[in-house]
């Protein structure tokens, strides 16, 4: 993120202020300077507040940011523009406040914009969602922003000196390590749940074990006394339980089967006795009913006689019924014949009417034929009528255009003749231009050679003069040097060395006294006075130094002048005087002018000839185009004339409109005539077809009538024969028999019922007699008592067996469930063992006594320290290195930082550092933290950093080192801004953002030193 523009309204000491960060060129290092309380830190607060709604330090609340001198009706707001990943964004945040005169607070506002195609487009307009949008956009929250972008006052060294718990809070926020703590809690809850599930499974096993039925059997009770916690013993006893349960079930089943057999015997005996009793009673009843049925025999015989007579007269009745049907058909057929004759007469009348219409239509046939002939002959004209119409319209225009084109063509031909006369025999001469150009170039070259030679001669004379001056200076300096060397040789340097022993002699004199033995020569000391004139020696020594300095100066001057002579000689050797023309410069200039004039004249002539040729070509092209247009005009005119001639010849019309009207009228008349003719023909065909159909119908009806008459005659003969056979003389006899037909169904039913019952009685009596023959009827009461006794015993044993069988099956299900629970429990214990171990390790129950979160944070801290030490080594002249304290205890430890002193080869507490050393360490650690967070976060773009702390504690050398470190950040493409009162920084940093205060408000401006 790189700041571009900051606008403050009623924010801290700034009532209305704008800061344009775009004035900072190439990510230049800049200083924010101002008096204490002027509002330097408020600039950082404004950026942090604009983005996150918080100040750059945790101690400042939002209410503390509003200016005390702000208008009560105006809100506090910050507008911040910044660049991120080559995109430009703008945020505008307005703080909540109670407007003067109101009692309720005006809500905060927050808008986020993005620049698209040179215009800002809104992205968010709500405080919460907008702040979340900024967090996701930057990839950091407010706390991370303070650590990465702004190192605020009072918090700069907080990370360095904080303990493990405090560092954990900082690192947890920066590296989002709470997810590892969440993992620990999840594992803890998972283990808790698993243990609860295991305990629940033990309870289920115990409950199932207690519910197993013992059948009051001592052996089973003994097996069930095993505790369910002994799951191996439970598994061992389950097969024994199943075997014993099967034995008990088999014993009960045997008793049940015996009781069932006894019950079935008495049940069968009772059933057979009851059946025999019922059969005897039924036999007696059927015999009585059979006697009563036989009494109806005479009546049935009379009914059968009537039914026989009805059966014999059936054919006669059918013939009589058929006669009635035939008579009805004959009557209907006669009606159809009459209707058909009437239809045929109507059709013949219609045909005569249509024949009259057809004759009238044929009388107009010749006129229609002439119209058809005209249409056929002129159809091609009508189909292309537009073509002929256009010919009439275009012929006059084409005549006029032809005359105009002829006149224009004649004018162009005359113009071409004039141009050809202007050109005459003249031709463009480009070879002459080339010759003149070559001559001019040669003359210019000769002139340039003369000028360059004159310039070279002047330069040579100047260099020779300089060389002579340098040689004279060298000779003078050599003479002076020789005199100085002679003067130096006159001094006795051996006596001058005593001056270096003055302090040594003074020490010896202070340590001895007269009469002592000299520690140098061994003689007795007679005098401690001055035997050597040290002042004179020092004076001569200064003179020698001065002479030696002058000698060194002379030698340097001689060497410099020799180098200058060498440089002059190289220049002289590089001067080249070329061979030049014998002609004078004046003659050459005169020839040059003559050739240039000749060249210009030839160019003008060539240009005129080319223009004339171009005009000739243009006129020739125009003549050609006019001729083409004229030819095209004549061709179109001929086509129009031919078309008009063709039209008038074929149509005999000279007017297109009249022709179109008559042609359409003829077509309409012909179409109407043809349609009418077709309509009449269709009607005649339809009438003919309808008459043919009706004639066929008439023939059909007449044939049917003849057939029906023949059928009626045959039917009458059959009736006479049947009456003769039945001895019937007239219709009265027949009608009497016909009256019985209404009772025929009832009579037949009565006869059939009698015969059916008679046969049933015979069969049933015979069956019952066979069932009761030779059988004895027993005492029913005794049999019933014995039956109930056996049945009760059987039901009791069946219920007992069902209960035992159900309990055995239930025991099997429960033991299977117990085995399943035990198997699942064993597998669960095996599977969850790793989770239990992992939960303990993550919770800190490991050889390092570290939770998973602290282990991760230690890894990140090691990375930060390694990165920080790269800069700290430079800033401390390779003396200090930050190290992590290795001592750990359970949970929150291992995050303290110590300093390792390479001079003493020992580590010590961070508090032992001086103020400047603490600043160096804090700065290095803060920059290392910033870079590691950027590496780990991926999406965070660190294009700027601001520092508000600590430069006043540094000496000059350390200050230079710290500034070099910050300048290196600039070279990596990051904007670096610092707040400091150190005056040296104003001279060291060229760009300064000055913050000035006039007691109630502040203002800012950029200036360069």
UniProtKB/Swiss-Prot annotation:
Superkingdom: Bacteria
UniProt-listed InterPro entries: P-loop_NTPase (IPR027417), Rad50/SbcC_AAA (IPR038729), SbcCD_Nuclease_C (IPR053380)
Alphabetical list of CDD domains matching this protein: ABC_sbcCD
Keywords: ATP-binding, Coiled coil, DNA recombination, DNA replication, Endonuclease, Exonuclease, Hydrolase, Nuclease, Nucleotide-binding
Species this protein is from: Staphylococcus aureus (strain bovine RF122 / ET3-1)
Task performed by this protein: SbcCD cleaves DNA hairpin structures. These structures can inhibit DNA replication and are intermediates in certain DNA recombination reactions. The complex acts as a 3'->5' double strand exonuclease that can open hairpins. It also has a 5' single-strand endonuclease activity.
Residues engaged in binding ATP: 34-41
Protein name: Nuclease SbcCD subunit C
């Amino acid at each position: 993120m790189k700041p571009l523009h900051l606008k403050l309204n009623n924010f801290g000491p700034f009532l209305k202020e704008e800061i344009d960060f775009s004035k900072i060129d190439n990510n230049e290092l800049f200083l924010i300077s101002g008096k204490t309380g002027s509002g330097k830190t408020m600039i950082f607060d404004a950026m942090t507040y604009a983005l996150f709604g918080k100040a750059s330090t945790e101690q400042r609340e939002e209410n503390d940011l509003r200016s005390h001198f702000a208008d009560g009706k105006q809100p506090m707001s910050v507008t911040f523009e910044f660049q991120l990943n080559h995109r430009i964004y703008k945020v505008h945040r307005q703080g909540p406040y109670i407007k003067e005169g109101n009692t309720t607070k005006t809500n905060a506002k927050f808008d986020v914009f993005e620049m698209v195609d040179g215009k800002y487009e809104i992205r968010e307009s709500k405080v919460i969602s907008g702040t979340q949008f900024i967090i996701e956009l930057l990839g950091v929250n407010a706390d991370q922003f303070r650590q990465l972008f702004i190192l605020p006052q009072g918090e700069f060294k907080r990370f360095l000196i904080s303990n493990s718990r405090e560092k954990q809070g900082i690192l947890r926020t920066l590296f989002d390590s709470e997810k590892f703590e969440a993992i620990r809690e999840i594992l803890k809850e998972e283990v808790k749940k698993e243990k609860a599930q295991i305990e629940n499974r033990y309870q289920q096993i115990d409950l199932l074990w207690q519910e197993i039925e013992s059948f009051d059997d001592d052996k089973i009770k003994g097996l069930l006394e095993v505790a369910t916690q002994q799951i191996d013993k439970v598994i061992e006893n389950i097969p024994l339980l199943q075997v014993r349960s099967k034995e008990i079930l088999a014993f009960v089943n045997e008793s049940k089967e015996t009781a069932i057999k006894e019950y079935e015997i008495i049940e069968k005996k009772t059933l057979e006795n009851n059946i025999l009793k019922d059969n005897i009673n039924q036999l007696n009843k059927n015999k009585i009913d059979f006697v009563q049925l036989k009494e109806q025999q005479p009546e049935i015989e009379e009914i059968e006689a009537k039914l026989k007579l009805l059966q014999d007269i059936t054919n006669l009745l059918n013939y009589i019924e058929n006669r009635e049907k035939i008579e009805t058909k004959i009557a209907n057929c006669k009606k159809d014949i009459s209707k058909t004759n009437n239809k045929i007469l109507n059709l013949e009348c219609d045909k005569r009417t249509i024949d009259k219409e057809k004759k009238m239509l044929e009388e107009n046939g010749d006129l229609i034929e002439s119209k058809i002939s005209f249409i056929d002959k002129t159809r091609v004209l009508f189909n292309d009528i537009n073509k002929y119409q256009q010919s009439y319209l275009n012929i006059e225009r084409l005549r006029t255009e032809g005359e105009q084109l002829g006149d224009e063509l004649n004018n162009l031909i005359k113009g071409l003749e004039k141009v050809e006369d202007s050109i005459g025999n003249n031709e463009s001469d480009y070879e002459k231009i080339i010759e003149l150009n070559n001559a001019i170039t040669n003359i210019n070259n000769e002139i340039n050679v003369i000028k360059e030679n004159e310039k070279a001669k002047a330069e040579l004379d100047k260099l020779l003069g300089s060389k002579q001056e340098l040689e004279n200076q060298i000779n003078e300096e050599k003479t002076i040097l020789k005199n100085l060397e002679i003067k130096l040789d006159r001094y006795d340097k051996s006596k001058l060395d005593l001056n270096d022993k003055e302090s040594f002699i003074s020490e010896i004199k202070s340590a001895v006294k007269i009469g002592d033995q000299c520690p140098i020569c061994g003689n007795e000391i007679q005098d401690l006075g001055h035997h050597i004139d040290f002042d004179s020696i020092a004076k001569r020594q200064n003179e020698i130094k001065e002479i030696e300095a002058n000698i060194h100066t002379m030698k340097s001057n001689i060497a410099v002048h020799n180098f200058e002579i060498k440089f002059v000689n190289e220049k002289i050797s590089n001067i080249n005087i070329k061979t030049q023309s014998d002609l004078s410069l004046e003659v050459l200039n005169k020839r040059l002018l003559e050739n240039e004039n000749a060249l210009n004249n030839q160019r003008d002539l060539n240009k005129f000839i080319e223009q004339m040729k171009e005009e000739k070509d243009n006129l020739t092209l125009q003549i050609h185009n006019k001729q083409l247009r004229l030819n095209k005009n004549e061709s179109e005119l001929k086509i129009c004339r031919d078309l008009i001639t063709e039209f008038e010849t074929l149509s005999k019309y000279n007017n297109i409109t009249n022709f179109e009207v008559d042609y359409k009228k003829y077509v309409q008349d012909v179409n109407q005539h043809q349609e009418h003719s077709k309509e009449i023909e269709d009607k005649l065909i339809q009438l003919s077809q309808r008459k043919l159909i009706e004639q066929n119908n008439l023939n059909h009806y007449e044939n049917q009538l003849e057939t029906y008459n023949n059928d009626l005659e045959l039917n009458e003969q059959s009736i006479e024969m049947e009456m003769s056979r039945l001895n019937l003389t007239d219709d009265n006899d027949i009608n009497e028999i016909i009256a019985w037909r209404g009772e025929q169904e009832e009579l037949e039913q009565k006869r059939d019922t009698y015969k059916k019952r008679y046969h049933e009685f015979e069969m049933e009596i015979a069956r019952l007699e066979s069932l009761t023959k030779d059988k004895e009827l027993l005492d029913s009461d005794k049999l019933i008592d014995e039956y109930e006794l056996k049945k009760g015993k059987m039901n009791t044993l069946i219920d007992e067996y069902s209960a035992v069988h159900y309990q055995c099956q239930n025991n099997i299900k429960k033991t299977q469930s117990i085995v399943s629970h035990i198997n699942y429990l064993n597998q669960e214990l095996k599977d969850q063992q790793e989770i239990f171990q992992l939960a303990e390790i993550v919770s800190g129950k490991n050889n390092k006594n570290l939770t998973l979160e602290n282990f991760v944070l230690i890894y990140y801290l090691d990375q930060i320290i390694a990165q920080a030490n790269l800069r700290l080594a430079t800033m401390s002249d390779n003396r200090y290195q930050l190290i992590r304290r290795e001592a750990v205890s359970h949970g929150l430890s291992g995050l303290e930082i110590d300093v390792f002193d390479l001079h003493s080869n020992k580590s010590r507490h961070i508090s032992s550092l001086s103020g400047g050393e603490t600043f160096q360490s804090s700065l290095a650690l803060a920059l290392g933290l910033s870079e590691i967070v950027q590496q780990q976060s991926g999406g965070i773009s660190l294009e700027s950093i601001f520092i508000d702390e600590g430069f006043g504690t540094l000496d000059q050398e350390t200050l230079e080192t710290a500034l070099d470190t910050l300048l290196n950040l600039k070279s990596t493409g990051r904007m670096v801004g610092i707040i400091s009162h150190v005056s040296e920084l104003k001279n060291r940093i060229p760009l300064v953002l000055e913050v000035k205060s006039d007691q109630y408000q502040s203002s800012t401006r950029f200036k360069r030193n």
